[in-house]
Each structure stands twice: as C-alpha cells, then as structure tokens.
Swiss-Prot record:
It comes from Danio rerio. This is Small acidic protein. Residues 117-128 have a biased composition (Low complexity). Disulfide bonds: none annotated. The gene is smap. Residues 46-80, 133-160 have a biased composition (Basic and acidic residues). InterPro entries: SMAP, SMAP_dom.
Length: 171
C-alpha cells in the first residue's frame, strides 16, 4: 500500500481565484440585476456607484444659497451659543452628579444681592429711618440665646423626619 502504487483520484484546486477577479459571489444566480447588486453590496463585494470624493455643500439638490449677511448672522449666532456653553461649563453653573441631597448654599448667591438691596435702600431712605430699620433687623442677644437651645429639645422622630426631608425635594 505505498503511495506510488495507487493512482491519483482527485485534482487540486488553484490557490488563488481567477485572474479576472470574479468569485463565486459574483457568479451567483440571484435573479434580477438589482437583487444581485444588493447582495454584493451587503456581502461587501460590490462596488459603489460614487467612487470619487464628494465635496460637502456641492450637491445638485442644493436649491438655495445663503447670502453673505445671512451667513455672517448664522456664524455670529453659533459663536454666541458656543461662548455661552463654554462660560456655563467653566463657571460650574450646571453642576450635576454632585451626590444625593446635594444643594449649593443659598447664602453665597443671596449675600451679594442682599448687600446691593441694602445699599439701594439706604440711598433712598433718610438717615433717621435707616437707623430704625437697622435696629429692627438686629434681634436682641437674649432672643438668639433662646433660639439656640430649641433644636436640642426636638424628639428623635422629629430629627429623623427633618433628615429624610432634607434628601427628598419636591420638583
């Protein structure tokens, strides 16, 4: 049973496809030419119609053209939107993902406004009325001392409720 005693039964296939480049996919009978093109396109073997570079904005379906003034206005609007978003991002105005129950301190935002409102009120009112309003705004020292111990007298349930309400905000 040596290999030289037996005759060869099969033939070898060529290692590469035809020199013309046709493969079995291109010779497949799929019916109409449209179906064949679709099949070849889906298999990645078909050529696309537009092989050249397509220039953006240079298309036959573009029926209207912008005037120079409209183009400048559009560019100015886009630049304005970009500056607004950049300022917002850098200032941290839209802070999200800061954590559960996080809220920015209101005092920081209100303190400049309060100072401005006090100065505007003082310029409008006579000096006699300013001193009276300042006296009314300043509570006596004994009142502040009485208010401080009050939070310690709350029960544990009240503390739990206020703690829970700090995390739950109505929208």
């Amino acid at each position: 049973m040596s290999s030289s005693d037996e005759p060869c039964k099969g033939t070898k296939r060529p290692a590469s496809p035809d020199e013309t480049g046709s493969t079995q996919w291109q010779s497949a009978d799929l019916g109409t030419d449209e179906r064949k093109q679709k099949f070849l396109r889906l298999m990645g073997a078909g050529k696309k119609e537009h092989t050249g570079r397509l220039v953006i904005g240079d298309h036959k379906s573009t029926s209207h053209f912008r005037s120079g003034a409209e183009d400048r206005r559009m560019n100015a609007d886009l630049e304005h939107q970009y500056q607004q978003s950049l300022d917002g991002k850098l200032s941290g105005r839209n802070r999200r993902h800061c954590g559960l129950g996080f809220s920015e301190p209101d005092e920081v935002a209100e303190s400049p406004n309060a100072a401005v409102s006090e100065t505007s009120n003082s310029s409008e009112t006579p000096p006699e009325q300013v001193s009276e309003t300042q006296k009314e705004e300043k509570p006596p020292a004994s009142d502040t001392e009485l208010e401080k111990p009050e939070p310690h007298t709350h029960s544990k349930e009240d503390k739990k409720k206020t703690l829970k309400m700090a995390f739950v905000k109505s929208t």
